[in-house]
Amino acid sequence: MTSRRIAHAGLFGSAIAGLALMMGSGSQPKFGDPLKGLTPDLLTRFKVGKAQFKSPENPFSGLGPVFNDTACFKCHTQGAVGGGSDRLETRYGRVEGGVFNPLTQFDGTLVHAKGIGFFNGVDFVGEVVPPEANVVAHRRVNPLFGLGLVDAVPDQFLKDLAQFQQDFTPATAGKALVLTDVASGQQRVGRFGWKCQIGTVLTFAANAYQNEMGITTPFFPHENAPQGDTALLAANPAQTNPNDTNLTPMQFADFITFLAPPPQRPSSLKARLGEVIFLGIGCADCHLPTMRTGPNEVEALNEQTFFPFSDFLVHDMGSLNDGIGQSPATGQEMRTAPLWGARIRTSFLHDGRAKTIEDAILAHDGQGLAARNRFADLHEREKANLLEFINSL
């Protein structure tokens, strides 16, 4: 292991001892459980949010008129309510002269695959990719486990981490993207979404409510117009506009915020050996093992160490990108996917093309290419140990 990686592991990723202790504790919540240590009031908020997360919407309450599904949990089921899934959504746009155009005239960049049907003389059907698009990408559904911990990481930590990478691992250095958070109106460092395009759990929840189900709120009041045809919205049967107050997204946010991180398997000898290889070949340069929350009024989120195996920064992934620009991220940049909970997934990478962890590693390009090549050069036993480690997360 080079001195550079020793420094990296020592300052930002010293997870070997910590993981061994945590995985051996036997006291972790199960998939889908709330964080440990919640007060009765917070536990009630978690349960109310979970019930709302599972509750289906209908056209009269604001569903659609074009949408992707009727309830959050329809897409978030893997492992437990709040998990990911292999379902894919479609994004599109147009690139000319190296500049990404989101084709806003079609209400881009997300295809809403379903419509609410016939109302007031209009047959609302699912959308299609417009012929003007020359970039089409698919994205699988990310799990929500542990996102309250991610939300509670101070912005300054992510900025410092990006600077640390620039100083010590410049070839793989990520970017901390600063954006205006819709829910708070404040400048935040993005950390959610495939492009780190969202800064807080509340904005994430409200954005999904509008984008995936078409439910408008004061946070996101823009109605989904089928293929961008706003004239059709006059036939929308929704009874209020916005369709919802901000209450429901806040309830979703309660569920997500208090949802525990994925439990990790007890560490075998092979997994421990694999962890050393994981650190040694540079995986941890981006898939940072350990993070810590800042001061928080919720004790379960207050200065807690957790193990996401992501730096929550964006990196230039070369050919392993989706081409979709989501400001401030470019089409080339993708967020480092957290590896916690990897063992229950059945597809990997943003578009689900990889069906095994090994395939996902071998598909790395751009700033992930060097680590990919080091993995490819390992002996088969070393590869097996590394994969055993990732499958313990």
Segment roles from a protein language model:
Residues L11-M22:
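Hydrophobic alpha-helical segments of integral membrane proteins
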Residues T2-G13:
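Bacterial N-terminal signal peptides that target proteins for export
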Residues S3-R4, A17, T90-G93:
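Short, intrinsically disordered low-complexity segments
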Residues L21-L393:
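Periplasmic c-type cytochrome electron-transfer domains
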